[in-house]
């Protein structure tokens, strides 16, 4: 599918249980945003369950699904990188397979790009139901490093909805 408007890249590890729900929800959102001009790149990170088999079945039955199988568990970052190397869309949406962050936010994110933003990413402001250690570690490992790397060298425009 040359000239795709959108690629959704999804690293997956032991996600067989939720794969059908991810497929259903992401398909609806992508269709609503760009019609038929999209792909969903699912990258398997050496899962021990039937994630790869489910991904392969989806890629056979749905022309929008591209399935990648890594030979072993390389970790989230390298799996994401493999997915990014395979995607062909003008815009790329990165989503974890566990659906902790809803794919239904994609229309809001693409609207921000339509408004002129080159890069749009989401970050939860309120983390309900998580213990203090998880909140603190999320800030230290994600929030602080993002804050440090982006605020020092790049102009940012924060938009909160």
Language-model segments: which ranges?
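A conserved acidic beta->alpha catalytic loop
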Residues: 44-52, 99-100
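Acceptor/aglycone-binding surface of glycosyltransferases and processive sugar-polymer synthases
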Residues: 57, 66-72, 76-86, 91, ...
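Acidic helix N-cap motif at the loop->helix transition within catalytic regions
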Residues: 17-21, 49-58
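N-proximal low-complexity "stem/linker" segments adjacent to membrane-targeting elements
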Residues: 1-28
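Short helix-capping segments at alpha-helix termini
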Residues: 30-36, 58-64
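Short beta-strand/loop segment that forms part of the nucleotide-sugar
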Residues: 10, 23, 27, 34-46, ...
């Amino acid at each position: 599918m040359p000239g795709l408007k959108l690629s959704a890249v999804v690293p997956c590890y032991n996600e067989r249980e939720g794969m059908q729900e991810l497929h259903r929800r992401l398909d609806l959102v992508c269709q609503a945003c760009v019609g038929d001009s999209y792909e969903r790149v699912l990258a398997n990170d050496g899962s021990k369950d039937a994630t790869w088999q489910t991904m392969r079945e989806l890629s056979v039955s749905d022309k929008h699904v591209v399935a990648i199988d890594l030979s072993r568990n390389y970790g989230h970052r390298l799996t994401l990188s493999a997915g990014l190397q395979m995607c062909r869309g003008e815009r790329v949406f990165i989503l974890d397979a566990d659906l902790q962050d809803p794919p239904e936010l994609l229309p809001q994110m693409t609207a921000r790009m339509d408004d002129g933003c080159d890069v749009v990413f989401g970050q939860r402001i309120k983390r309900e139901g998580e213990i203090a250690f998880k909140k603190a570690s999320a800030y230290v490992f994600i929030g602080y490093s993002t804050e440090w790397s982006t605020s020092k060298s790049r102009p940012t425009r924060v938009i909160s909805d």
